[in-house]
Amino acid sequence: MYKRYKDVSLILKIVIGIIVGAVLGVMVPSWSFIDVLGKLFVGALKAIAPLLVFLLIMSAISKYRSGAKNHFGTVIVLYLSATLFSSIAAVAVSYLFPIKLVLPGAMKIAESAPKDLGTVVTSLLTNAVANPISALVEGNYLAILFWSLLIGSGLRLTSAVTKKVVTELADTVSAVAQNVIQFAPFGIVGLLHESLSKTGVKGVMAYGQLLMLLVATMVFVYLVVYPFMVWLMTRKNPYPLTFWTLKVSGIPAFFTRSGAVNIPINLKASKDLGLNEESYAISIPLGGSANSGGAAITVSIMTLATANTMGVHVSIFLALLLCFLSAISATGVSGIAGGSLLLIPMAASLFGISNDIAMQVVGIGFIIGVVQDSVETAVNSASDLLFTATAEYADDRREGHPVDIRAKVKAAGKGTAEVVTPEKTNEAEESEQV
């Protein structure tokens, strides 16, 4: 029974949940028992999210390898830079187009925001070095991020078996989170019913503005910011490669909503481009963790929308801190449907916003997630391919071998590109030495 339920598209189930929740919220707003579904769903997310974030970040950091003879270093720089620039763009857009959400009962459980810079820094440092076990129990995401980075760095020195155990633990908790997310349609029924019964249709319409802002920012980043990065690295017209990656990788990712499912597609596309197999065989799978520009946009915009709703003044310092925090914390979630939403409580804690308020915003995220998460996954997955190719072309340019990107893309479309394998790379090096 459950297997048949899981086989049904999550998008379809969420759409049905939205329709049912909206109808019940308008027709029978007095049926408060329906709200329990939303409370159960949010409660389950609150329980699993801290452990999920901890293991994902720790696992991703532990896998980093240095000294390998490939374009890996350039790819990592591009991945991290793209995630940071995406977060900065999201913060800038949030300042230009501030949005307020309607959160039922928000003012009753809001915490006071920190006032001065000294208080903010002291609070951040104190929270970051809290006991890691207590942090997992209490949902202290700053401490979770701090300890996962440190432990992940330490794990780089351990054996492959140890790293495999950590990876399998992360995969196990991810599977649990995925099972929880499978019940999102029921949670959405409860959340939407509660929102409509307490705030009316006008309050829910504000979610449409939030969705438009999220999607517009992601489109801007992929079609303006990322191409500019490609041009800086290659000094070639970036748009043939940009649009090609959207077509071959972004469109499938939009419908599957899973970066992990899209990895084979990206590997084949890299082969079609004639990229170095030794490089893309590592960078494409890692991109699911290290390259999370779409997730950083979601976290930044939804966190600032929450701050605006609560009347929290966001200083330039806190905004910049949010950019870095969103970029770092987004590492590891782009392979999970709806994973970026689980990072909102951590980012919201910067502004003294309670976990209860943040989880209400997570609920809103699942309501708009049919479109938001699809676009986010498309941006993340397509940019894995975009930056893997860019890194190799940039390194070739530095070595005095500029690449005709348009010709490469055209050849890839026809399947006539020359594939660069590790063996061919070694042969080329031997020829140069002779």
Swiss-Prot record:
Ranges that cross the membrane: 14-34, 41-61, 72-92, 135-155, 172-192, 210-230, 282-302, 316-336, 351-371
Molecular function in Gene Ontology: amino acid transmembrane transporter activity; symporter activity
A Pfam short name: SDF
Alphabetical list of InterPro entries matching this protein: Na-dicarboxylate_symporter (IPR001991), Na:dicarbo_symporter_sf (IPR036458), Ser_Thr_transp_SstT (IPR023025)
UniProt keyword terms in alphabetical order: Amino-acid transport, Cell membrane, Membrane, Symport, Transmembrane, Transmembrane helix, Transport
Location of the region described as Disordered in the Swiss-Prot/TrEMBL record: 413-434
Gene3D superfamilies hit by this protein: Sodium:dicarboxylate symporter (1.10.3860.10)
Gene Ontology biological process terms from the UniProt entry: serine transport; threonine transport
Cellular location(s): Cell membrane
Location (main, coarse): membrane
Catalytic activity: L-serine(in) + Na(+)(in) = L-serine(out) + Na(+)(out); L-threonine(in) + Na(+)(in) = L-threonine(out) + Na(+)(out)
Lipid bilayer topology: Multi-pass membrane protein
PANTHER family named among the record's database cross-references: PROTON/GLUTAMATE-ASPARTATE SYMPORTER, PROTON_GLUTAMATE-ASPARTATE SYMPORTER
Protein task: Involved in the import of serine and threonine into the cell, with the concomitant import of sodium (symport system).
Protein name from the UniProt record: Serine/threonine transporter SstT
